[in-house]
C-alpha cells in the first residue's frame, strides 16, 4: 500500500496537493500545525477540507513554541501584514523563520510512524514570495538530513515547485477541484476564506494566478501538463 503525508494548511497550494495525492496514493494522511498564527482560522478550514477530500487521518499538532521564537507579522498581532508591493525586495515580514524546517521534520516523523513513503508539501520556487525555506535546494538538503537522521528513506515531494500560480489553478482544475479550491480554501494572511482580503501578497498572488488561468485556460493547462508530466 502506498501512503503519503501532506503538510496541510487548508490553503490553495496544500489543498491542490491533497487533491492530487488522493489520486496517486492509496492512503493519505494530513498534518496541520498550530503555531499561534494570525490566520488561525486556517486550522478549521483544514479540518473540513481533509474530511471532505477523504484523508485517512488528520493530525493537528501544537507547535506554539515556534510563535515564541519566530517574530513575524504572522505570529505577532502587533506587526501589521503589509499590503502587496510588486517591487518589494528582501525577505518579507510574513516570513516565519524555521517554519518549514519544523513542519517538514515533524511530518517526516509522522510519516515514519504510519509507514508512509512520502511527505508532500506545496512550497514553490517559481512564486516563492522571498521565503528561503520554499526553495528546491532547501527542501532537498533537509530531506537528505532527515533521512540520515532516521535511517529511513522518506521522500519529500514538491509537486508545485516549478509551476506558477496560474498553473497551480490548472492543476486543481485537472483534478476536478477548481471550485472547491476557489471557494473553500484559506490562503489570506489576514485569515479570510475564499478570495481573501484582496490586499496582502498571498491574496494578490492567488488572484492574479486565477485571472491568468481563467483567461488563458487551454495554454496554461498545456503548460502545467508539460511541466508536471500529467496527461
Curated annotation (Swiss-Prot):
Example of a GO MF term: zinc ion binding
Keyword field: ATP-binding, Ligase, Metal-binding, Nucleotide-binding, Queuosine biosynthesis, Zinc
EC assignment: 6.3.4.20
Enzyme class per UniProt: ligase
Cofactor note text: Binds 1 zinc ion per subunit.
Cofactor section: Zn(2+)
Listed pathway(s): Purine metabolism; 7-cyano-7-deazaguanine biosynthesis
Chain positions recorded as ATP binding sites: 8-18
Residues annotated for Zn(2+) binding in this entry: 188, 197, 200, 203
Superkingdom of origin organism: Bacteria
Database matches in CDD domains: QueC-like (cd01995)
Reaction equations catalysed: 7-carboxy-7-deazaguanine + NH4(+) + ATP = 7-cyano-7-deazaguanine + ADP + phosphate + H2O + H(+)
Record flagged with keyword Transferase: no
InterPro entries linked: QueC, Rossmann-like_a/b/a_fold
PANTHER family: 7-CYANO-7-DEAZAGUANINE SYNTHASE
Homology family: Belongs to the QueC family.
Function: Catalyzes the ATP-dependent conversion of 7-carboxy-7-deazaguanine (CDG) to 7-cyano-7-deazaguanine (preQ(0)).
Protein name: 7-cyano-7-deazaguanine synthase
Native species: Salmonella typhimurium (strain LT2 / SGSC1412 / ATCC 700720)
